Amino acid sequence: MVLLRVLPEIHTLTPTQLSGAACVWCRHALRPGEGIDLGSPGPARPHGCLSCCESKTRSLRTYLDWYDHGITCLRCPTGPCDRGEALGAAHLAVREEAGQPPMRCCACETDIAPGELVRPYLWERPDGPVLGYLHARDCPLPRPPS
């Protein structure tokens, strides 16, 4: 179920992506039997190409390593310790390599600028866990009005 959290929102996918004939991330056309079945509740059958799936797996693995450290470290919530900084840097490098969009703070809903202190933030929704980020200290801006 966690892998579904890294899928694009279902409503943003094309019919070709929903049917599994194209990668959900890069839109590369997939021949029958090619690609990795990502599963889905409901009629959609999304697939990913090997390159994108490997990239997303590395990103998820480094995120969870960073998160797991942060929930047990007494220092990391106010700014990373050396290990937390190394784990965060590893995750950010994987994100950059994968061409992922800028991180957004779950609290203030603004993009997190390069160099800002950040920490992973995981919470549960009824449809599964959500992997996000928070500014490591106070958010620089108030949350925009809804």
Regions found by a protein language model. Name each.
Residues 7, 14-17, 74-77, 107, ...:
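Intrinsically disordered, low-complexity linker/tail regions enriched in polar/charged residues
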Residues 9-21, 39-43, 63-67, 90-102, ...:
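Short, flexible, mixed-charge glycine/proline-rich loop motifs
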Residues 23-26, 49-52, 73, 105-109:
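Short cysteine-rich clusters marking metal-coordination/redox-active sites
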Residues 33-36, 57-61, 80, 84-85, ...:
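Short Cys/His-rich "knuckle" micro-motifs
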